[in-house]
Amino acid sequence: MSLVSGLTEVTDADFETEVRGSELPVLVQFTADWCGPCRQLAPVLKDIAFEEGDRLKVVQIDVDRNPGTTVAYGVLSTPTLMVFRDGEPVRSMVGARPKRRLMEELADVL
């Protein structure tokens, strides 16, 4: 079940295929059920996924259930947002932010 309705949840098992193997840039939210700022960010990510779906894939991964990927990318805080392009991380951002600011930060990777 998705942590945020409307967003795809990835796991340690399918991260390689879903994120690193994607033809589109991928915005990954490293999140947790107990994370308040993650919940604040949820409507922003849903909007971006809907509006930018042809240019950007938006997914989430639960840090508690997927420690392998979390550790592999050095995620220490939630929410951490990481952008992958051509299978490699190209941007990392920590903390919730309004949609306008997030879109400005994503402009050069879209």
Language model features with spans:
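Conserved residues in the N-terminal Rossmann fold of short-chain dehydrogenase/reductase
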Residues: 60
